[in-house]
Amino acid sequence: MHTIYVDNNATTAVAPEVVEAMTPYFTDIYFNPSSMYQPARQAADAITGARETIARLLGGVAASEVLFTSCATESNNTAIHGCLRAQPGKKHVITSAVEHPACWRCART
């Protein structure tokens, strides 16, 4: 039997090439990239390299402008708060009931 998964909003299967690329960081280079010891530097270097690659792919973006977040909620909150800070004179956020709760909760605060 073949499974058809239709809840990709919650989670989705990881592409095999992503699993292959990330395996070293789940098994061997799992260190805190903010630490000062050598294995941690490997993790930090990998993050720096990923940030530079993404900036290059986006074009016209500095690596320092690429932010990594831990989840969709954090990403949504960062984007919404960033837009609000960029437009301090604007006092309203328009959203709808079909938005993800992370978006409308953030908009309400």
Residue ranges: model-predicted function:
Residues 1-109:
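Pyridoxal 5′-phosphate
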